Curated annotation (Swiss-Prot):
Function as written in the Swiss-Prot or TrEMBL entry: Involved in transcription antitermination. Required for transcription of ribosomal RNA (rRNA) genes. Binds specifically to the boxA antiterminator sequence of the ribosomal RNA (rrn) operons.
Domain of life of the native organism: Bacteria
The protein's name in its UniProt record: Transcription antitermination protein NusB
InterPro entries: NusB-like_sf, NusB_fam, NusB_RsmB_TIM44
Gene3D superfamilies attached to this UniProt entry: NusB-like
Keywords (A to Z) from UniProt: RNA-binding, Transcription, Transcription antitermination, Transcription regulation
GO CC list: cytosol
Pfam families: NusB
Protein species of origin: Chromohalobacter salexigens (strain ATCC BAA-138 / DSM 3043 / CIP 106854 / NCIMB 13768 / 1H11)
GO annotation, biological process: DNA-templated transcription termination; transcription antitermination
GO molecular function: RNA binding
Family designation: Belongs to the NusB family.
Amino acid sequence: MSQTPREATPAQQSRRAARELAVQGLYQWQMTGKSITAVESEFRAQIADEDLEDHENWHKVMGIADLALFHELLHNVAADREAIDKTIAPLLDRRLEDLDRIELAILRLGAYELKYRLEVPYRAVINEGIELAKAFGATDGHKYVNGILDKLASRLRSAEVAARRR
């Protein structure tokens, strides 16, 4: 039986869960100033925390997440933050510091994937950013994320974008 276009494969679900965790980890890193290693350790420790208010959901997400991808995204976005921010900043209608922190985390993640994870189609990066913004961002934050990532894709992956638009 073939899957409908809207059904995510287990591998896609695993990558999406990794991105969800990475955005939450980046948000925590931005807000607390803790090291990215400490943030990751806290996330992994929460798997075993039976007293966690949302333990069942947390365990489910961590259970399906591609933890190697989570680690890569979390650490590499943090390590390359300055370069990523310089790539994003010219596309914004406000200062980077004035962005909603969750939207900033999503934009940083999307910029990293557009720049370095070339095996991921640019449309998938944009769609994941939109879904993350719908799940975690402000009411219309997904529209802003969509616009910025679309502009960024045109700059970073011009050949791929041009081929898609033909």
